[in-house]
Amino acid sequence: MAIVSAEKFVQAARDNGYAVGGFNTNNLEWTQAILRAAEAKKAPVLIQTSMGAAKYMGGYKVARNLIANLVESMGITVPVAIHLDHGHYEDALECIEVGYTSIMFDGSHLPVEENLKLAKEVVEKAHAKGTSVEAEVGTIGGEEDGIIGKGELAPIEDAKAMVETGIDFLAAGIGNIHGPYPVNWEGLDLDHLQKLTEALPGFPIVLHGGSGIPDEQIQAAIKLGVAKVNVNTECQIAFANATRKFARDYEANEAEYDKKKLFDPRKFLADGVKAIQASVEERIDVFGSEGKA
């Protein structure tokens, strides 16, 4: 199956009561870990780059080619979409041109009418190239590449208007935030999600800020129409924790580890990369997308 646009497998998730994972990557090792997990679980997956991560990786073309080449060289058989996460208008257009198979245009920080106008333009350009489109209404809380939101509830009429632009799936604020959730977070507003899905029957909803939401809330949201769940912070924390532990062990056993040449970055980072894969596999289980490739 290899590289595909995402609209068909996201819609299949919506139609059949599970969700697919959108997992953010930051480099080669991160991408390998996500691909290994998806292949092991036989799950369709979106590998996502934020604007900042793509810049870190050398630009959108480099990031796109890295993911595509790894899919080929690793013999990946499950559907993989190369997705831009939270892209500004110009970034969305660039990703369409360099071969991303799915993009998110995030104009949620703009006035509603401008957000809708630009989303429609992005849809026209993307669909002409066979690229799927996600857009957002109701700012997701937290910060993502300079876009700051406090966790709004997406207005129902705005959500309906955004779907009418022709997008393929919708990110809608339901009290979710990016990054670690504070202890006083009140949880997802599932009543508002139900109102959204009743207004948009059968349409796939995207849950951003998937890291740190209790599993039972995620699964309840999936039952109500969420078909894609984004995960980033959870994998970052897993990688950092495993790498820190290895570094502490190295410090305590320096002579032995030096003799084994464990300073080699391929070895030094190995536990962290394994932790990413384990996190992705665990999320796939929670989302119910194992075996759905």
Each PLM stretch: what is its role?
Residues 225-256:
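A hydrophobic, small-residue-rich beta->alpha segment in the mid-to-C-terminal subdomain
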Residues 207-212:
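Short catalytic/ligand-gating loop segments at beta-alpha or beta-beta junctions
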Residues 4-12, 16, 28-53, 60-77, ...:
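Alpha/beta enzyme core
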Residues 248-293:
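Extended, intrinsically disordered, low-complexity segments
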